[in-house]
Swiss-Prot record:
The gene is gatB. SMART domains: GatB_Yqey. Its EC number is 6.3.5.-. GO terms for molecular function: asparaginyl-tRNA synthase (glutamine-hydrolyzing) activity; ATP binding; glutaminyl-tRNA synthase (glutamine-hydrolyzing) activity. It comes from the Bacteria. The lineage of its organism: Bacteria, Bacillati, Actinomycetota, Actinomycetes, Mycobacteriales. It is an enzyme of class 6 (ligase). Belongs to the GatB/GatE family. GatB subfamily. This is Aspartyl/glutamyl-tRNA(Asn/Gln) amidotransferase subunit B. Keywords: ATP-binding, Ligase, Nucleotide-binding, Protein biosynthesis. The keyword NAD does not apply. Transmembrane segments: none annotated.
Length: 501
């Protein structure tokens, strides 16, 4: 850790004893539309640089924007799911700034007239309680291009020798969701920040409006934070930590900023209003001074008509909303007959949707929970990734469960198959065949291993023949070891008892 070193940070318990954190979360979500916000260019991740561009998204003279209707519908659906009021009339504005990621030198956004206002999201926390986060607004805008800075140790523009611009992302439809100040969280502020982004991600995924891949930038979080002495009404000076790119990092970034700002304030210093960059090592570093709305010189976008959603159309979209995550979880809990504690563990591990998808592929809920809630959670923790980022699908887990149910794999062998899938060795059946892991059920092969184990353990054989049937477990264990766990244990036991009778 650099920037403010760990030794210079105030102890977290001291922070929450002296200061009250105030948070504000801004989440940018790229919409999964076929084309961009204001032109017909493809909206697809991973294409060769600057191959999905046109005069509109490059800001060439004479080009005019045309609004993407699907993006408007997605914005309304998001607003409705967040319990927002969908306004009867809104319009776009130009946000003016000069930076290479925006070839027009302005971004088409919404300023004082967003499409959705005054909502809320009830966020489940680790202990089973909920925290209501109030939503100030959700507004439409276009994304910027992506810059790659070369020659800089940090990967940022400071110190770079060259900067490469890829405008494939310029003009991609975005929804920015802005909360009202989150007060009263105290020591739980980092947890609530992570839980909010998690709940929002799950909601957007359920709506089908975005793939919400934080690792690919289709969901990006900016965390605003200020501290004020406990009992003080006036807010402190806030910082904005930009583009935090994982759920865990949201929690780490908020906790770090609380400790850093507290250290500044207790030493008699002043917190500067600025943007800050989050580093994967767990610290933030200064960016630029935080701009105000006046700096961007907003004015109405003259090339786009206002948007006036018809009330009947809005109601149609409301009625078409899918089952929302919290309702789905309640239904699933009843169907599976699991306790609140088990459900809470599945939710906290990010496993609930993966388990449900595995059940839909034919696995039992018990088997699906065992895989996603135990073994695969461990693998995700070992890899330092979210559970849904593991390179294995619910369909593949269901296939492993079927191989076990069919008697082709034992639970121990199944874990080896899953490890092979995670290593990219192919589908479960292929991994089983390539690694030679299928359970041995052929009596002739098993009998040879049993005979060898019996010959090596005459004392145990005498115990079995003397009526101590439980001693057969030692012979079964020897056979399982000799066959590297591939023998059918139940059949081996039958053969052992038959040989000793």
């Amino acid at each position: 850790m650099t920037a403010t070193s760990a030794a210079e940070l105030l102890d977290y318990d001291d922070v929450v004893a002296r200061f009250e954190p105030v948070m504000g979360m801004e989440v940018h979500v790229e919409l999964s539309t076929a084309t961009k916000m204001f032109c017909g260019c493809a909206n697809a991740f991973g294409a060769e640089p600057n191959t999905q561009v046109c005069p509109v998204c490059l800001g060439l003279p004479g080009s005019l924007p045309v609004l993407n209707q699907q993006a408007v519908e997605s914005a309304i659906r998001i607003g409705l799911a967040l319990n927002c009021e969908i306004v009867p009339w809104c319009r776009f504005a130009r946000k003016n700034y000069f930076y290479p990621d925006q070839p027009k030198n302005y971004q088409i956004s919404q300023y004082d007239e967003p499409i959705a206002i005054n909502g809320y999201l009830d966020v489940p926390l680790d202990d089973g309680s909920t925290w209501r986060v109030e939503i100030e607004r959700a507004h439409m805008e276009e994304d910027t291009g992506k810059l790659t800075h070369l020659g800089s140790d940090t990967g940022r523009i400071a110190g770079a020798t060259n900067s490469l611009a890829d405008y494939n992302r310029a003009g991609v439809p975005l929804i920015e969701i802005v909360t009202r100040p989150i007060e009263g969280a105290g020591a739980r502020a980092p947890e609530i920040a992570r839980a909010y982004v998690t709940a929002l991600r799950d909601l957007l995924r359920a709506l089908g409006v975005s793939d919400v891949r934080m690792d690919q930038g289709s969901m990006r979080c900016d965390a605003n934070l200020s501290l004020k002495p406990i009992g003080q009404a006036e807010f402190g000076t806030r910082t904005e930590t930009k583009n935090v790119n994982s759920l865990k990092s949201v929690e780490v970034a908020v906790r770090y900023e609380m400790r850093r700002q507290a250290a500044v304030l207790t030493s008699g210093g002043q917190v500067h209003q600025e943007t800050r960059h989050f580093h994967e090592d767990g610290y933030t570093s200064p960016g630029r001074s935080k701009e105000t709305a006046e700096d961007y010189r907003y004015f109405p976008e003259p090339d786009l008509e206002p948007v006036a959603p018809d009330a009947e159309f809005v109601e149609h979209l409301r009625q078409s909303l899918p089952e929302l995550p919290w309702l789905r979880r309640n239904r699933i809990q009843q169907e599976w007959g699991i306790s609140d504690e088990v459900m809470r563990d599945l939710v906290n591990n990010g496993a609930i949707d993966l388990v449900a998808a595995t059940v839909e592929q034919g696995a039992s809920s018990e088997a699906a929970r065992a895989w996603w809630g135990n073994f695969l959670v461990q693998k995700a923790n070992e890899s330092g990734v979210e559970l849904d980022a593991l390179p294995i699908t619910p369909a593949q887990v269901a296939a492993v469960v079927k191989l076990v149910d069919d008697g082709k794999l034992s639970n121990k062998l199944a874990r080896q198959v899953v490890e092979g899938v995670l290593a990219g060795e192919g589908e479960p059946a292929q991994v089983m065949a390539d690694r030679g892991l299928e359970v041995v059920r052929d009596d002739s092969a098993l009998q040879a291993a049993v005979d060898e184990a019996l010959a090596a353990n005459p004392g145990i054989v005498e115990k079995i023949r003397g009526g101590k049937v439980q001693a057969a477990g030692a012979i079964v264990g020897a056979v399982m070891k000799a066959t590297k766990g591939q023998a059918d244990a139940a059949r081996v036991r039958e053969l052992v008892l038959a040989a000793c009778s």
